[in-house]
Swiss-Prot record:
Stated name of the protein: Probable alpha-L-glutamate ligase
Record EC number: 6.3.2.-
Listed cofactors: Mg(2+); Mn(2+)
Gene name in the database record: rimK
Residue positions binding Mg(2+) 2: 260, 262
Limits of the ATP-grasp domain: 104-287
Cofactor remark: Binds 2 magnesium or manganese ions per subunit.
Source organism (scientific name): Saccharophagus degradans (strain 2-40 / ATCC 43961 / DSM 17024)
PANTHER family: RIBOSOMAL PROTEIN BS6--L-GLUTAMATE LIGASE (PTHR21621:SF7), RIBOSOMAL PROTEIN S6 MODIFICATION PROTEIN (PTHR21621)
Database matches in InterPro entries: ATP-grasp, ATP-grasp_RimK-type, ATP_grasp_subdomain_1, RimK, Rimk_N, Rp_bS6_RimK/Lys_biosynth_LsyX
Entry binding sites for Mg(2+) 1: 248, 260
């Protein structure tokens, strides 16, 4: 098979591993810089051009699109969908996952466990917003944040008010969530491939840090999931329409709650923590599912 990995950096661990895993299984794997792709969208025969030439037909495309290029990246994926190429994650699903509020609304509507969550831009009654989600301690997030940036823990209602007032000054959209104290600064990253959790790790925040992101000095270890945690991760992936994703779960007194569904999960942390060849499992999924026009939206989304 001929497979394209859409990635801005061929040296990233995840990109390298996908290429290695594909080639080890006898496939041709090209790494394509998403932003260097360009298209004539009025052509009767859809195509993607790159470095002055039309790209060949690919049996599958693996989008590795960073949050900062979501708009253009999903347009490129959509063009491949219009060409009939199988895309591991569809453009509509990627766009959906990048909108944190929309994601939480969809998950809530389908009954997926979530922390109590409020959403605001410029609330005229800050105290009521805080009260509505159960009061401090609270986690306050900028909607556009990634890797733990723009995430603050407010220990008291007064602190929460001050943080919200500061964030409002940025003219930003804000999420306010209950703090799951019993999670102890840890979360579980479930790596889902084709409606199955293929690997899972527990990420523990550094001492004194409530955020468990590995980019912020957290550590990761292999974890055994309960049936409920496994089902929650798979259900969240289905609701979001993602074939390959990372589902971040907190262990609360009321059962597992989903914090985020990541459409471009990194491989380094999960492979190192679990000693599993996750990249090869992604390739297995492609081999079983990559058929022409096997994309639900077919670029119409």
């Amino acid at each position: 098979m001929r497979i394209a990995v859409l990635s801005r950096n061929p040296n990233l661990y995840s990109t390298r591993r996908l290429k290695e895993a594909g080639e080890a299984r006898g496939h041709t794997v090209d790494i394509i810089d998403t932003l260097h792709c360009y298209m004539d969208i009025t052509m009767s025969r859809p195509a993607v051009r790159y470095h002055g030439e039309e790209l060949p037909y690919y049996d599958a495309v693996i989008p590795r699109i960073g949050a900062s290029i979501t708009f253009y990246g999903t347009a490129v994926v959509r063009q491949f969908e219009m060409m009939g190429t199988f895309c591991v994650n569809e453009s509509v699903a990627i766009s959906r996952s990048r909108d944190k509020l929309r994601s939480l609304q969809l998950l809530s509507r389908k009954g997926v466990g979530l922390p109590r969550t409020g959403f605001a831009n410029r609330p005229d009654k800050i105290k009521d917003l805080i009260k509505n989600v159960g009061g401090a301690p609270l986690v306050i997030k900028l909607l556009e944040g990634t890797q733990g940036i723009g995430v603050v823990l407010a220990d008291t209602n007064k602190t929460a008010e001050s943080i919200l007032e500061a964030f409002m000054g940025l003219n930003a959209n804000i999420l306010v969530q209950e703090y799951i104290k019993e999670a102890g600064g840890a979360d579980i990253r479930c790596f889902v491939v084709g409606n199955k959790v293929v690997a899972a790790m527990k990420r523990q925040g550094a001492e004194g840090e409530f955020r468990s992101n590995l980019h912020r000095g957290g550590s990761a270890t292999l974890v055994r999931l309960s049936k409920e945690e496994r089902a929650t991760a798979v259900n969240a992936a289905k609701v979001m329409g993602l074939n390959v994703c990372g589902v971040d779960i907190l262990q609360s007194n009321n059962g597992p709650v989903v914090m985020e569904v990541n459409s471009s999960p990194g491989l380094e942390g999960i492979e190192n923590a679990t000693n599993k060849d996750v990249a090869a499992l992604v390739m297995e999924f492609i081999e079983a599912n990559a058929k022409p026009n096997n994309t639900k939206t077919r670029g119409k989304g």
